[in-house]
Amino acid sequence: MELRVANANGSCENGSIVSLYCSSQEVLCQIVRGISPEEPYNATLITWQERVRKKYGFYIGVGLAFLSCFLIGTSVILKKKGLIRLVATGATRAVNGGYGYLKDPMWWAGMATMSAGEVANFGAYAFAPATVVTPLGALSVLISAIFSSYCLGESLNLLGKLGCVICMAGSTVMVIHAPKEEKVTTVAEMASKMKDTGFIVFAVLLVVSCLILIFIVAPRYGQRNILIYIIICSVIGSFSVTAVKGLGVTIRNFFQGLPVVRHPLPYILSLILGLSIIIQVNFLNRALDIFNTSLVFPIYYVFFTTVVVASSIVLFKEWYTMSAVDIVGTLSGFVTIILGVFMLHAFKDLDINQISLPHTHKNPTPAPAPEPTVIKLEDKNVLVDNIELASTPSPQQKPKVFMTDS
């Protein structure tokens, strides 16, 4: 069997027609993309990868975000149980600078689960915009709230369950209205955006505020105010998200055959990511050691998401290409998620369930106040008539005279 190739016009430019002859069969092919000898051998594979990414990349990113939420929500429970066991042994607590939890297998199981969740989160940021992946973290709040009621004995009443449903509704709205296209595709573009003056000023403000919280505010008020440790974790978390996003672009460019190994940005981002994870784990353990899990995680999610979305707006400018309807929809979804998280936390101590709900009544209307007793002053004639004599007065007794003023 002989295969012959013939070109009608003698040109190999894009759009040219090439004929393939095999025995008595003829096939006409059109050149869509030419590959020069200088291009890498996997250029055809790159084209296929790009087609798959453009068509399914957004949904792959959302799926990885859901998986990440499940793993991270579970890891919080495991780490909390490890910290509880540490307190039971009498060792130095994490909030007091102790690191005894490093010897607890339950805590390490939580760290392993969280690492797997972060890997899935890493992949999600590589495929989907940060304004989609980060708000979906509300589902990890939902998962931790459900598991904490079964594993840690923390109650989840009817309003808490309703808050979970509201979180899922808000996440769905955000996914529908979030930007589908990612504008940063190369390491050079990522480096150019990080050199932008607006992002540099924003990053400097975050670093300065974080240093003030760590070295001045946290030693004095960290054990009394839950917001101190959570704000530190949230601010540092925004840098970790930026680093993950940049490393995701680096990995894609590496498999596309682009020269990214010699670029300094991947190494800088790796250093930022490592430092961010260490600081986050340290202060998140302190918050979990003192405060309730159902209190720490929802508040942490709200602050973390707010800072990350602000960072995404400054760095990637993903919102600039969105329509007004999508912007309003995304903000509405985010506010809905915050309301759901608020319901999870604010009403967690109320004893409200499906059984007691029908018997819940409004406070009864208070009875009207009784009228004040009015003492009516009698006149002198009535007073005289009402005098009762104990007995008939004897002649020796002097008469009693009552004086009344008229």
From Swiss-Prot:
Inducing or repressing factors: Up-regulated by low magnesium ion levels.
Enzymatic reactions: Mg(2+)(in) = Mg(2+)(out)
Pfam families listed in its UniProt record: Mg_trans_NIPA
Compartmental location: Cell membrane
Cytoplasmic compartment segments: 79-126, 177-197, 247-263, 317-326
GO CC, alphabetical: plasma membrane
GO molecular function: magnesium ion transmembrane transporter activity
Stretches assigned to the Extracellular side: 1-57, 148-155, 219-225, 285-295, 348-406
Keywords on record: Cell membrane, Glycoprotein, Ion transport, Magnesium, Membrane, Receptor, Transmembrane, Transmembrane helix, Transport
InterPro entries linked to this entry: Mg_trans_NIPA
Ranges that cross the membrane: 58-78, 127-147, 156-176, 198-218, 226-246, 264-284, 296-316, 327-347
Any Gene Ontology biological process: magnesium ion transport
Chain positions carrying an annotated carbohydrate: N9, N14, N42, N292
Topological type in the membrane: Multi-pass membrane protein
Function: Acts as a Mg(2+) transporter. Can also transport other divalent cations such as Ba(2+), Sr(2+) and Fe(2+) but to a much less extent than Mg(2+). May be a receptor for ligands (trioxilins A3 and B3) from the hepoxilin pathway.
Entry's family note: Belongs to the NIPA family.
The protein's name: Magnesium transporter NIPA4
UniProt source species: Mus musculus (Mouse)
